[in-house]
Regions:
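Peri-catalytic and regulatory segments of divalent metal-dependent proteins
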Residues: 2-140
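Cytosolic-facing loops and C-terminal tails of multi-pass membrane proteins
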Residues: 1-48, 186, 196-354
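Low-complexity, charge- and small-residue-enriched intrinsically disordered regions
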Residues: 54, 157-179, 312-314, 318-338
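Short helix/loop segments within enzyme catalytic domains
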Residues: 61-66, 73, 77-79, 157-224, ...
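Post-HEXXH active-site segment of zinc metalloproteases
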Residues: 135-166
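Residues in soluble alpha-helical coiled-coils and helical-bundle/repeat scaffolds
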Residues: 133-136, 188-189, 240
């Protein structure tokens, strides 16, 4: 069984872009109103009842091997409780964490059939990571907004403001996957297991699939091309809930190379009992700073151009913060700036969330 991490905080695996994007999402005009409206329309009970009626719940007497893997993941990440786990009939290799106050996890049958035990463990770690990072509420809301169809037209926010909120939620949603991939690695503690799962998700099935070649493909995707290619890559992601598998592999490799993964394995990690108030400016500033440092190390053409042109991502982020607060960049911040608050497939029947 992998090493356990008692009292580990989700901050240990959260990608700085995830935290920064979530903070930015909360600043989008109309976001609070969208949350209130969707919460008024959504109910956790129907989601749970439909899943209970249409899928198979995992337990000691049902999928006992899968249940044992799941219990190990919960212990490894020191989850405070067991979240119900279901397997639903769907050949697509995928999984998802669903719900609000009482989340649960759904594995597609294709995931159980196509992955080995270690890879299934990594998928379970990914989903538990989403829950422990408090991603599930917003993810459930986003799937509802994307699938709401005509129901959304009855909402007073329908139109451009709502589109802006959905676009911001999609951007955060993609970044949240990078955090969950790190939790996935902590759950299985073998980088090649997570890489293998990403390879299979991208189409690498059968004995001929090669992790080393796929990592080289990821490197070529990230480094190759011009700044225009980077724009094309960005546009290609706009309507996707997940980054491309090669991007996820590259991000995971960078985290490993940074030494942060080994640091956690050695027992040095932030503790849940010491989690800061996420509403503080210091917390957001730390996320922006970490994200900016990642861009400095990036081989992406746009990031290279920004460095060569002397454009600092951190400065841009600070400028955005000033704009959010309605303050001119030239104004001197108040003495108590740091104390200011930051201010202003969901369901088992489809491809959900790996």
């Amino acid at each position: 069984m992998p090493a356990r991490f008692p009292n580990i905080s989700s901050r240990a695996w959260e990608h700085p872009a995830d935290r920064a994007a979530l903070e930015s999402l909360r600043k989008v005009p109309g976001f609070d109103l969208v949350v209130r409206k969707v919460m008024g329309l959504l109910s956790e009970r129907p989601l749970k009842l439909i899943t209970l009626g249409s899928a198979v719940e995992v337990g000691p007497d049902q999928y006992p091997r899968l249940n044992a893997l799941y219990e190990e993941v919960l212990q490894t990440l020191d989850a405070p409780e067991r979240y119900p786990l279901f397997v639903t009939q769907n050949p697509v290799m995928n999984a998802g964490a669903v719900g609000m106050d009482h989340p649960f996890i759904v594995l597609n049958s294709g995931t159980v059939l196509q992955l080995d035990d270690a890879q299934v463990r990594s998928v379970l770690g990914h989903e538990v990571g989403h829950i422990l990072s408090d991603h599930v509420l917003y993810k459930t809301m986003l799937r509802f907004l994307l699938k709401g169809g005509q129901l959304l037209t009855r909402m007073p926010l329908a139109g451009l403001p709502l589109l802006a909120v959905v676009a911001a939620m999609l951007e955060w949603d993609r970044k949240s996957e990078l955090s969950a991939d790190r939790a996935s690695l902590l759950a299985c503690q073998d980088p090649d297991v997570v890489r293998g799962a990403l390879l299979r998700m991208a189409g690498g099935v059968g004995d001929g699939a090669n992790i080393t070649a796929f990592r080289e493909q990821a490197r070529r995707y990230e480094e190759g091309g011009s700044a225009l290619d980077s724009v094309i890559k960005t546009l290609a992601l706009l309507n996707r809930s997940h980054p491309f598998p090669v991007q996820r592999m590259g991000e995971l490799d960078r985290w490993i190379e940074s030494g942060a993964y080994e640091e956690i394995l050695s027992g040095h990690y932030p503790l849940r009992d010491e989690d800061p108030d996420e509403s503080t400016w210091d917390y957001w500033r730390e996320s922006v700073g970490s994200y900016a440092e990642g861009v400095k190390q990036s081989t992406d053409p746009v990031a290279k151009w920004m460095r060569q042109a002397g454009t600092g991502v951190k400065d841009k982020a600070s400028g955005a913060w000033d704009w959010i607060r309605g303050r001119s960049p030239d104004e001197t911040p108040p003495a108590d700036e740091d104390e200011l608050p930051p201010g202003p497939e969901v369901g088992p029947d489809g491809v959900i969330d790996l």
